[in-house]
Design a protein with these regions (language model features):
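Glycine/small-residue-rich interface belts in oligomeric ring/scaffold proteins
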Residues: 11-83, 87
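Structured loops at beta-to-helix junctions and adjacent beta-edge loops in soluble globular domains
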Residues: 21-22, 58, 69, 118, ...
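Conserved small/polar residues in nucleotide/adenosyl-binding loops
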Residues: 184-188
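Internal, conserved structured core segments that host functional sites
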Residues: 62-132
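A general structural signal for short secondary-structure junctions and capping/turn motifs
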Residues: 7-10, 46-47, 56-57, 105-108, ...
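Short, well-structured alpha-helical segments that form the helix of a local strand-helix-strand
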Residues: 98-105, 172-181
Length: 188
């Protein structure tokens, strides 16, 4: 399960804390995070099949991440949809505010997705079901419709909260993102 854990409380020098993984479609060729030549100041991995990305940040502080949402009724129409990785890439390459960007996204042109975008001042979330409010201090996004609770997501959320309530290291966040793999015996 792909996972985005995001907290935006005032944590000392941190504007937000993010921990994320890309945990499916391993056979799909990707390039590890790098500074893109054709987009000034963009640090992101790259989907080598479609050219987009699942998570990226710019030197100016723009951030975006996407997960797919399993909507099996769409599978037979797959060839008619745009790449979800372009949602991230296009936001990071635009000057639109997060609110303006999500208003312009035509969600019906993509297979199921959850997208988080930010300029470090404002955060917005849009899914294939529409624009969502982002007023929580902690957001957990997986491969299901937003606000869907599963054991995997609940466990990851509780572990993330626990880490945030103490002095944490980058390694703590890496271990957290590897941990949900051990939850695979649980039903999503």
């Amino acid at each position: 399960m792909c996972l985005i854990l995001l907290s935006k409380p005032s944590l000392g020098d941190y504007k937000f804390v993010l921990s994320s993984n890309r945990d499916e479609f391993y056979e799909r060729k990707t390039k590890n995070m790098f500074w893109w030549n054709n987009f000034d100041g963009l640090l992101a991995g790259q989907d080598l099949e479609q050219g987009g990305t699942w998570l990226g940040i710019t030197k100016s502080g723009r951030f975006a991440a996407v997960t797919n949402v399993r909507e099996f009724y769409q599978i037979d129409k797959k060839e008619n949809f745009l790449s979800r990785g372009d949602l991230v890439k296009n936001f990071l390459n635009s000057s639109l505010s997060p609110e303006e960007y999500v208003q312009k996204v035509e969600a019906n042109k993509y297979m199921g997705f959850n997208l988080v975008v930010s300029d470090l001042k404002h955060f917005s979330i849009i899914s294939s079901q529409g624009i969502e409010s982002f007023n929580q201090e902690l957001v957990v996004v997986g491969n299901r419709a937003l606000n869907t609770e599963t054991k995997k997501l609940n466990n990851a959320k509780e572990d993330f909260k626990s880490i945030l309530n103490q002095t944490f290291t980058h390694q703590d966040l890496i271990e957290l993102m590897q941990k949900p793999v051990s939850y695979t015996h649980l039903r999503a």
